[in-house]
Amino acid sequence: MRSNHLFFRKVMTRLEVHPLNNSRLFCISDSSSTSLYSEPSKGSTIFAQQALDRFDWDLSIGETAFENMTDDAKMRNDPGMLVGPDGMLITPELLIASPGKIDVFDCASLDDTAGALEGMSLASGEGSNCMQAMRPRSETRSTNTTTSRSVAKQILRNTYGPVRYKDYANYLGSPENREVLREFIALLQPLPVSLLFSLRKLSKSIYFIAEAGAIDAMLEEMSIQWVERHKPLHYQDNYKLVHIVLFSLLILNSDLYNDMAQMKFTSAQFVDNTVYALLRESPTIDKQSFEAELRVYYDLLAMDQLPLHKPPITASHSRDSANPTKKSSVFYSRGHRMERTYSNSSTYSMSTISLQRTTTAIAAKQTAAVASWRFHNFSDLPLIYCKEPFDDEMNNTNDSSWLMDHIIQFQEPLGSVSRAAAASMVSPTAQPRRKLFNWLKKGQPDSIFKSHHEFGSAEGKWYNARVRISEGRLYIFNFKNQPALDPKTADLELCRRRAASYTVQNLFGAMATFVQDNIVYKSNSQTTWNFAITFPKTIDCETERTYQFQTSNMTMAQRFVQAATFWSARITPLPSAQFEMVSNQEYGWGEKLLSRQVAATDVRLTDWMPLIGIDSIYDEIEDSGDLTVDSQLQNLRVFTEHLTQLLDQHNSYKPKMVEIWTQNPSTQQFEMAMENWNRRYLYLNSMYEKHYTYLRALETAFETVTG
């Protein structure tokens, strides 16, 4: 027993009590000073503190201060009796008679003196929150609870023999071990008010390299127990909001301390995009409270990364680390919410929920990463097109412009790295970068976060995949070398659980292309046909990403291209603003110059650049859902005609420019003028080709439903 004082905290409304010889049991009221016996109050909590605790409690901002117990408040020598802070005896009869005054009292095993409390669960009849509704408690505790608690303790001590310590997180995250996970998180109590401190506590308590499903399950359980304990108003008693913040912090940590990522997320980017995800979950949140809290989290995390759990050096651990051939789990998605299902190597990185902010509404709102995150977390994916009467039937017609769903070959996305150094984007007080776990080393096979630049090259390996194009989105379930699940027998939920990895991409601004030349598949000399889908760099990624696919027949490849192009054309808004710089600067074809009102020797040329990128000029994504297919068709016809006129006009400049600039003695000026002309021509032509392709695909699809 601690001599004069026993530290305690007012903690969550659920606690398993362990009758150890060195533990003491107290009842603490809301004010931490009033006896529950004399003044029972809603929110009172039963709290057990072990004298020989192996962890020091984390201090965090806003955490309830530690209080000193008086000698009178200590446990009496009678084992199992509960005593209030002023020494009043709390009997089982009192607890039974006042269930409405106690949120939850969950006692798995007390000794004989308090045997009447064995297995009792008392929950408040008032103000029950979403966790209580979601996770109802049975009247009697299962005998498995004691076993689960024992296993959880062994995992916390790194002594659970049946599983390697590096696989503890995977073990806890599996659905069949959910009760063990609950007990494990309960052993980390009290969880700090600060979610970052709570995440640190978890990170240093277990080897946190695991499949995404396992990590997600652990964060979910921590979120549930955190909300049961803490009641900040801006979290609305909603564990999903906590889950989003925890997940965002974890991914931010990987971004800040990933040596391969030169451009780090700024505080504003992290805050804005996390708040956006929170608003998607609950539109009524207090934005200012979350923004202030997230800014503090960013600053703290920028100074010190999440700790890596290092278990005691033992012979068994040494053997584990010396055997790199053993299966190392990867961050895979788990069936739970928008991007949390059971897949095995989810391709979402920092952009999954804390999205890269760019000037485009696409990147800021409905990016491909948001689609993946929502799909992973079982959130309903928003409708991103204007639904019409013919859509109900066509959305269920495979091998059509509306739906393509087949097993084909898939190669992980290609993308070049063009990240600029971004030291200025990181807090100047940040300490030197340290590697984040083993996750983020280049080429590390068990990396849980895949960066875009790690994707395969044109000579990369092909994998079995189920690929689906439907309602404006591309779904890829990568089964690696295992047989992919047939769409006829497996739904999307089963694919999420079985796939090695998966991704969901919105087709905003995407471009699908068919490879005309057939390819001989090297392994079996089988003729195959390729197609690719490229996403603009402003959508979820700083560089263009190209997904490559391979089919066994030409027709299927062409149909995939048509479906992808149709949906891109249908949902991608057309540029509605000026997309070229309007200024008095001269690029080599100014009206006064071409009419010879100004001599070439008297002008100073400037490099021509588009005002913004081709795919950064769309209106808000939500607006695209207001247009019918027919309206989008008309707009595309008008826009492509406008681009045709611009191209014709630009081509007419060329002869005059050559005549004028060849007379200029400056070769450098001539080359600069020609380069400007060529750059603008390529820009306009690329816009024309893309939108003309959209127009043809939309016309082809529309004809099938209008005759």
Curated annotation (Swiss-Prot):
Domain PH: 447-571
UniProt KW Cytoplasm keyword: yes
Taxonomic superkingdom: Eukaryota
Keyword terms of this UniProt record: Cell membrane, Cytoplasm, Guanine-nucleotide releasing factor, Membrane
SUPFAM superfamilies named in the record: Sec7 domain
Pfam families: PH_GEF_YEL1 (PF23633), Sec7 (PF01369)
Gene3D superfamilies: Arf Nucleotide-binding Site Opener,domain 2
UniProt subcellular location: Cytoplasm; Cell membrane; Bud neck; Bud tip
Gene Ontology cellular component list: cellular bud neck; cellular bud tip; cytoplasm; plasma membrane
Gene Ontology MF terms in the entry: guanyl-nucleotide exchange factor activity
Region (Disordered): 127-148
Membrane topology, from the record: Peripheral membrane protein
GO biological process, one term: regulation of ARF protein signal transduction
Sequence similarity: Belongs to the YEL1 family.
Role description: Guanine nucleotide exchange factor for ARF3 required for localization of ARF3 to the bud neck and tip and involved in actin patch polarization.
Protein name per its UniProtKB record: Guanine-nucleotide exchange factor YEL1
Gene: YEL1
